[in-house]
Amino acid sequence: MLTTNPGQGAPKSSSHTPVEEHYYRRGDIDFCFLLNRQHANLRVFDYRVGNYQQKRDFFDRIARTEGLRKVFTVVEKQDSKSWRSVGFSREGAIPGYFRTADAYIMSRVYTDDGEPIQGGAPKLNSPTVATREPVENKPRGLSLELVRDEDRLKEVVRDNGAGALYAPFRRAMFNPDIAIRGKVGKREFWVGAETDSSFGHAKVDMLTPPAKESDIDHLEFMRRALLDELLAMETASVFSIVAFDSIDSAAIYNSLGFKVSAKLTDHIVRPGGAYAGAQLWHRRIGASNAPRMPSFI
């Protein structure tokens, strides 16, 4: 179990929650990290100070203690070299993640015994995704609702997050802040987004993955409607992390013009406990303008 000593930061959420936000500061090392127990990984938010080898050793200890499969960070190009020098591997990029700069995903994967895999993260082969006709007209019987209510969105994640392999990507809020609810008869569908107005990007998720052929059309149209909402919010770049073998979900993103920009080894854990690789699908939807400045400046 992770423990954080006084003066080194404290857990922001209880150890019973799937995702915990922690802060660590000691000497010249200062960073934040998200511990995701459900998917056995940890994301580092680095403040670019301190010795990288000491940081790596710190995360190696957490990985062994917590039984983690993976530690990763999302950084600009110049910082990726420092992480690579201490044993992290580049698994791909998120174009436009920092609005005017791309992000690089640097990862360290561990064995079942908690030892770093020698040679870096194993490479994944891309599955074949069929090309399909875009769904530009609303499918018959589908009604849509735009949802921003935080309590409703938290409930959607509680009810559907595990089955949808949902994994929060940002700090402080562990659910989408905007979503489209679709309904056909008695069936509900949800697609959501975690937005970042400072950098103009959003992570999008299907919180109810397709279960049958007709679901694909419904979810694609809903995703298209969500992209329209994000564009109206001046979002420039969107991305999604999709399990490697979720071919139907991948087909939706492919139809919407997304491209694979990263292949992530053992990035998620299925409900039965099996590790699964993932692909990061990306698309630019708007112009990359300068970051928004706070109103008090």
Where are these regions (language model features)?
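Conserved acetyl-CoA-binding loop-helix of GNAT-fold acetyltransferases
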Residues: 49-62, 214-231, 251, 255
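Conserved GNAT acetyl-CoA-binding A-motif
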Residues: 63-75, 231-243
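Conserved active-site tyrosine of GNAT-family acetyltransferases
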Residues: 82-83, 252-254, 258
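Short amphipathic alpha-helix that is part of the acyltransferase structural core
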Residues: 2-14, 32, 37-48, 117-169, ...
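Conserved beta-strand-loop-alpha-helix junction that forms the acyl-donor binding cleft
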Residues: 72-80, 240-250, 267-271
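A conserved beta-strand-loop-helix scaffold within acyl/acetyltransferase catalytic domains
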Residues: 20-41, 158-212
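Conserved catalytic-core motifs of GNAT/GCN5-like acyltransferases
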Residues: 74, 89-105, 259-274
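A short, internal acetyl-CoA/4′-phosphopantetheine-binding micro-motif in the GNAT/acyltransferase core
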Residues: 40-53, 111, 206-218, 242-243
